[in-house]
């Protein structure tokens, strides 16, 4: 019975667009986020006026994850920023089980707490990546 249910997920992923993608076609920085973080990321990019240098891939649901589209997005980016409100970087770990998320070009901005992300937090990380300032990668 479970196998039958999971086969239905594949059909859903093939039939519907399960993600939002916006920004540059060949981005310097690709941002991966989901849920409420997507709106904050969109606000930060608009405020910085870097739509021509940054792109965002935001799955609407994480299961089924649109793995083919996500991998194509990852491959098109020079560097990646994963944004999430989770100290343990659960979204990042989930992505790594589904796609090739190269550690060498991936920066993870994760933190705990009940407070939502701010556009200023995202802007700080994007500025760092766009100016090639190195940062310790924790996840």
Label for each model-derived stretch:
Residues 33-36, 58-61, 74, 83-87, ...:
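Active-site proximal loops enriched in glycine and acidic residues that flank catalytic Cys/His/Asp
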Residues 36-73:
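Generic long, charged, amphipathic alpha-helical segments
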Residues 27, 77-78:
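Short, well-ordered alpha-helix to beta-strand connector turns
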Residues 1-20:
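Conformationally flexible catalytic loops at phosphate/diphosphate-handling active centers
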Residues 50, 66-76, 85, 92, ...:
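Feature captures the catalytic cores and cofactor-binding loops of soluble hydro-lyases/lyases
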Residues 80, 84-139:
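Peripheral docking tails and interdomain loops at the edges
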Residues 24-31:
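A short, charged/proline- and glycine-enriched loop
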């Amino acid at each position: 019975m479970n196998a039958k249910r999971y086969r239905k997920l594949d059909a859903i992923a093939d039939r519907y667009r399960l993600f939002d993608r916006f920004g540059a076609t060949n981005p310097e920085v690709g941002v991966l986020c989901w849920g409420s973080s997507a709106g904050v990321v969109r606000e930060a990019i608009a405020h910085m006026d870097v739509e021509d240098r940054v792109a965002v891939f935001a799955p609407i649901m994480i299961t089924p994850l649109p793995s083919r589209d996500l991998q194509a997005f990852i491959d098109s980016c020079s560097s990646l920023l994963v944004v999430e409100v989770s100290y343990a970087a659960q979204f990042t770990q989930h992505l790594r089980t589904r796609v090739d998320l190269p550690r060498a070009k991936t920066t993870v901005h994760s933190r705990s707490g009940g407070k939502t992300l701010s556009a200023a937090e995202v802007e700080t990380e994007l500025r760092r990546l766009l100016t090639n300032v190195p940062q310790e990668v924790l996840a």
